[in-house]
Amino acid sequence: MIVRKNMGRAKSLLMLLMVLGFFFATYNLVSMIMDHRAGNWVADGLESFDRKMLGSASTNAKYHVALTATDAAYSQWQCRIMYYWYKKVKDMPGSNMGKFTRILHSGRTDQLMDEIPTFVVDPLPEGLDRGYIVLNRPWAFVQWLEKADIEEEYILMAEPDHIFVNPLPNLASRTQPAGYPFFYIKPAENEKIIRKFYPKDKGPVTDVDPIGNSPVIIQKSLIEEIAPTWVNVSLRMKDDPETDKAFGWVLEMYAYAVASALHGVKHILRKDFMLQPPWDRHVGKTFIIHYTYGCDYNLKGELTYGKIGEWRFDKRSYLMGPPPKNLSLPPPGVPESVVRLVKMVNEATANIPEWDSLNRS
């Protein structure tokens, strides 16, 4: 499925964001945005948060699963596995999943349009991401939220390298979205930098949660307000050399955390939201496997992280095309989480049509 409309509106909105982002470069841009009430898409901190979060929604409300992606083979094969497991767990007891959308920010259709529900949006103007493609994520969400018809009251912001390992309920409450605490997102330890974007008059630096935008379950009305601020903060962070150097590949995650704080939003921190092999060894009642790290082991089942193992599974080994079917299982002694990951990848690749031939870069 493809939905694409009113791109002119989206481009106009981007121009507005860029003007705000660069015209006020010598001032605190975010403060200016928060005071700019004429634009309905950015609200006024805690007042907006209270207004939106005191609605009638209950925590068993359905949420829409949304992930951003490109048309590169590396992104495509991960999306196919993710969508396979979404369909497997969607209607299981305990799940509050609604519909699914792959937000494709390549600006054009690809060969998965008929397989995965997809909404095509524009990428940032050429060169604006400075090679950091993840900057397209907040802008993709802004466009999708503005133009798509979304039935659910809540949204799960997910990523292609997520696998649903257990049915996922709506973890958000009536007053707070739910997020996952990342050990490497440390606002307090980076207070000097955070204060460039979250000044002292806004509150303590502990207002900034140790999260990224994914996984997060959040009310649609709330992310509609946060997303444009997220775009602005991301661009400002990337434009600041000190911030860019300090935050590196997690810059966009910090930007979401700061944008949320600017809107007075605190997240429920759920460690059981997600596990990340090989560091998290057991699946238990966790809901999502995030296979962002390489898993390298010797044949004794000992982790050799940082050194290519005699047995390995690393998504980056498959940049140009999908992994083969029936990957070898890890040797004895490897943690359950890694074994479960490989088995789930194998099940998906065995059942997805045209796995070996569809998406090659």
Swiss-Prot record:
Annotated GO CC locations: Golgi membrane
Q: How does it sit in the membrane?
A: Single-pass type II membrane protein
Any transmembrane segments, and where? 13-33
What coarse category fits the chief subcellular location reported for this protein?
Answer: Golgi
What InterPro entries would the database entry show? HPAT-like, HPAT/SRGT1-like
Molecular function terms from GO: hydroxyproline O-arabinosyltransferase activity
Q: Can you state which reaction this protein catalyses?
A: trans-4-hydroxy-L-prolyl-[protein] + UDP-beta-L-arabinofuranose = O-(beta-L-arabinofuranosyl)-trans-4-hydroxy-L-prolyl-[protein] + UDP + H(+)
Q: Does the keyword Membrane apply?
A: yes
Q: What is its EC number?
A: 2.4.2.58
Please give the knockout or disruption phenotype noted for this protein. Answer: Dramatic increase in root nodule number when inoculated with Mesorhizobium loti. Inhibition of root and shoot growth.
Compartments (UniProt record): Golgi apparatus membrane
Q: Which UniProt keywords apply?
A: Glycosyltransferase, Golgi apparatus, Membrane, Signal-anchor, Transferase, Transmembrane, Transmembrane helix
Protein purpose? Glycosyltransferase involved in the O-arabinosylation of several proteins including extensins and small signaling peptides. Catalyzes the transfer of the initial L-arabinose to the hydroxyl group of Hyp residues. Probably involved in the arabinosylation of CLAVATA3/ESR-related (CLE) signaling peptides that move from root to shoot, to interact with receptor kinase signaling that regulates nodulation. Involved in long distance nodulation signaling events.
What protein does this entry describe? Answer: Hydroxyproline O-arabinosyltransferase PLENTY
